Amino acid sequence: MGEIEQRPTPGSRLGAPENSGISTLERGQKPPPTPSGKLVSIKIQMLDDTQEAFEVPQRAPGKVLLDAVCNHLNLVEGDYFGLECPDHKKITVWLDLLKPLVKQIRRPKHVVVKFVVKFFPPDHTQLQEELTRYLFALQVKQDLAQGRLTCNDTSAALLISHIVQSEIGDFDEALDREHLAKNKYIPQQDALEDKIVEFHHNHIGQTPAESDFQLLEIARRLEMYGIRLHPAKDREGTKINLAVANTGILVFQGFTKINAFNWAKVRKLSFKRKRFLIKLRPDANSAYQDTLEFLMASRDFCKSFWKICVEHHAFFRLFEEPKPKPKPVLFSRGSSFRFSGRTQKQVLDYVKEGGHKKVQFERKHSKIHSIRSLASQPTELYSEVLEQSQQSASLTFGEGAESPGGQSCQQGKEPKVSPGEPGSHPSPVPRRSPAGNKQADGAASAPTEEEEEVVKDRTQQSKPQPPQPSTGSLTGSPHLSELSVNSQGGVAPANVTLSPNLSPDTKQASPLISPLLNDQACPRTDDEDEGRRKRFPTDKAYFIAKEVSTTERTYLKDLEVITSWFQSAVSKEDAMPEALKSLIFPNFEPLHKFHTNFLKEIEQRLALWEGRSNAQIRDYQRIGDVMLKNIQGMKHLAVHLWKHSEALEALENGIKSSRRLENFCRDFELQKVCYLPLNTFLLRPLHRHMHYKQVLERLCKHHPPSHADFRDCRAALAGITEMVAQLHGTMIKMENFQKLHELKKDLIGIDNLVVPGREFIRLGSLSKLSGKGLQQRMFFLFNDVLLYTSRGLTASNQFKVHGQLPLYGMTIKESEDEWGVPHCLTLRGQRQSIIVAASSRSEMEKWVEDIQMAIDLAEKNSSLAPEFLASSPPDNKSPDEATAADQESEDDLSASRTSLERQAPHRGNTMVHVCWHRNTSVSMVDFSVAVENQLSGNLLRKFKNSNGWQKLWVVFTNFCLFFYKSHQDNHPLASLPLLGYSLTIPTESENIHKDYVFKLHFKSHVYYFRAESEYTFERWMEVIRSATSSASRVHVSSHKESLVY
């Protein structure tokens, strides 16, 4: 081992000039005096598996050793890294930067300390230095080899292909296979060799810096990126793993994330002996504080994990290093541990303010790479592009969610892999660039509360592109953690897995990861946008016709979910009977073919309408003739439309009778392309005709009777009105049928929810008064029964039915004065009474109105009540047992809050989960209104604290905005549920100074959207108001006033 000390430094190996390192101290600070005394030699294993020896005073604090390593590497952003070493009980711990080394490393001659990445930021563009990104890439390579970073074969092959590109340069099949034979990057590498070589061929011309960037771009989307698992058990003794990340504390079962606790929701972390305790902040409408308890192997394991959590919280959430507390005079209680070092905010500010000189370095991965042309290419151009990208990018702490979509992380045991031979990839030593090359202002900003909102992630992984200049980002909310990877029980799967389908053939812009929507695609300046808007025709009819085009694009994509994606999946899996196939697909394919041609005709007419050379030809400036021709054609397709309700019923019956078909459909719903429940797509053709009717009504209202297009528009309106009237009854019946089946998937504890005659009325969140105080429950109102449920801490993310109240004979009254609880109601049934409280007066009034209506219906149809109750969960308790039974259900809830039993994956982006987290409700009437208010088109988006506008393709449906980079994308990149949001017009003080801008805000989360014309602005306001007012029921007539809608 003594030979290690005689090795040349990385700088001398790479031919870099000697330097004295870069100080990481803040301005005005002085380095602590280095303790004098005996020097001790400590061996450090670098990320490339080489070892270096450092002599430091044995009584020096750990920070001295870490600074020595960072100075040796000339590493500016050393705060992301740490030193791992075994303690006296052989437990691997992080070196405490404040404690003397002699107390932490007892036998330094026999200990090898590892220099590794400690803090993984949510976005690798926050790493300012190319050297830092290179070290992160080495960490990813190491995690792959050691089985920590689990992913599917495609992801693994793509990751390795970027590593190979970085190490040996451009594709050469013989050299590739020789290199792969000598270097094992992953245990199952032999099976992936052909795929790795195929992917590597696509990286020709990519520099090592670009390869590192793309490697991190892919890796950061994997669920296990930067995750270190710590074994534990929950209260019930279920074996789980705990981990900590930039977003908060995560819970895993195997390699599958089943829950997460966002930092914003955590009030206190503590440990008592072997018990690790998480105290959550109370809900806004409840004073009850939930404390979760996990049992670890020993006190030392527990304390070690607690320290890691404290450090992650401080590094990612605090603005500056916490000040030490004064030591007690007589007695001390608890651990004195505290975070030491700069926070991420301080690191980003230090780089942004030009606190260092730009560092460049030359890498020489191997002898092969040193003789290839790629190794000699400068990386300054790429660094400049990245720097531009970082100048205006909003930095956010990604929640992950994020969201349903195919899982990329495979389950299984963690394989043990020996590290590569030392010396194969020497540690990098950077060389300095000329003075004055400073980082541009605005390279980074601290995360704001607004930027932490989580939207459901549906990441699309394609071949990543080099970063482009950007102007902002799109995020969503920890308040919506139900839709993220940080959801309790769940934004991913419900747990939203950030598992991209890594297809290198799809060349699209770098996609977003929930909640970060990169602005690297479609950057536009305000001047460019103004120029584009001025070239549009000014006639309102043009924008009405354009709405037909944009919504038709979305409709075709929805049809393709059935005709292309679902049919392709069915053909690969023999899970569907032939009779069901022949009922579904032959009745959708003619519609897809017809509407494909319809869209072409509309777009051709719009192109002529917009063309400068044809601007004066009035015959092109109409759409009524195209609509009339195609609506007449739609009448011949009515036979297929009538079959859709039959297909929906047959599919649900098939799912009920076949477990295999049920699992197949559930797995398909978890794919990113299926962004809504599967049965919703089966009803899309029935809904589409209503939109044609609305468009033609607007055209007829706009055109005077003398207009050339008026007669065609009126004839087309008459035709589509007739079709809508014929299909209306079927549509109402099928919407209720579809909603019952959708709710059935969200509930456990009731198997016979869908019975003839049952109608859904309202669902939403209410607080139920019990012996433990007010506790949040999810209520489901039907025309015969009221169910109340709780959401447990489970992987399935479903709601457990805890009780039912038959409506027949029920009474309802307000009881605020009786119980002293605002917005309180007493529901008194024949067998049981409960007290509930709504979140607001308006919510209470909506529940009272709908419950009373349902009670009246139950009274009128009393002869049906026994049949309905027989189909509900059995409830044979006597009135005397009601109180005890209710108490038992509370105990069940307590157990479910900590039960981490692995169940089948489940969508976590349904309206039930949105209402749970937004503490609101929706009715069947609201769902029917939502069907009539669907819209698609381009919008410009900006944040409250960002400067530029980003162009996005936006689809509004099901109370939710879905965001795409362009209309050609097959699935959304992110989504933002709008229940609970307020819709307003920006005030003068907000300094927007643009036309056609509207604002969406929920608590501290603010988004600005900008339309291209007055008509599209009014349409977006109209449809979004339908979602926001379903929660608030506040209407304002003029959109020019800055008022809540």
From Swiss-Prot:
Residues where Phosphothreonine is found = T24, T883
User: Which spans does this entry mark as compositional bias, Polar residues?
Assistant: 471-489, 496-511
Q: Does the keyword Nucleus apply?
A: no
Q: List the disulfide bonds.
A: none
Q: Name one GO molecular function term.
A: cytoskeletal protein binding
Carrying Phosphoserine, the residues are: 20, 23, 340, 373, 389, 403, 418, 427, 433, 510, 514, 833, 872, 878, 889, 896, 899
Q: Does the keyword Ribosomal protein apply?
A: no
Which cell locations does it reside in?
A: Cell membrane; Synapse; Synapse, Synaptosome; Cytoplasm, Cytosol
User: What keywords would UniProt list here?
Assistant: Cell membrane, Cell projection, Cytoplasm, Developmental protein, Guanine-nucleotide releasing factor, Membrane, Phosphoprotein, Repeat, Synapse, Synaptosome
| UniProt-listed GO biological process terms | dendrite morphogenesis; synapse assembly
Q: Which GO terms describe its cellular component?
A: cytoplasmic side of plasma membrane; cytoskeleton; cytosol; dendrite; dendritic spine; filopodium
Membrane-spanning ranges: none
Q: Which Pfam families match?
A: FA, FERM_C, FERM_M, FERM_N, PH, RhoGEF
Q: How does it sit in the membrane?
A: Peripheral membrane protein
Q: What are the PH domain coordinates in residue numbering?
A: 759-856, 932-1029
User: Where does it mainly reside?
Assistant: membrane
Region (Disordered) location:
1-37, 392-534, 866-902
Which stretches make up the DH domain? 540-730
Q: Which residues form the FERM domain?
A: 40-320
Annotated domain remarks: Intramolecular interaction between the DH domain and the PH domains can stabilize the protein in an autoinhibited conformation.
PANTHER family, from UniProt? FERM DOMAIN CONTAINING PROTEIN (PTHR45858), FERM, ARHGEF AND PLECKSTRIN DOMAIN-CONTAINING PROTEIN 1 (PTHR45858:SF2)
What does the subunit section of this Swiss-Prot or TrEMBL entry state? Interacts with CADM1. Interacts with RAC1.
What biological function has been recorded for the protein in this entry?
A: Functions as a guanine nucleotide exchange factor for RAC1. May play a role in semaphorin signaling. Plays a role in the assembly and disassembly of dendritic filopodia, the formation of dendritic spines, regulation of dendrite length and ultimately the formation of synapses.
Question: What name goes with this protein?
Answer: FERM, ARHGEF and pleckstrin domain-containing protein 1
Task: Please name the source species.
Answer: Pongo abelii
Species classification: Eukaryota, Metazoa, Chordata, Craniata, Vertebrata
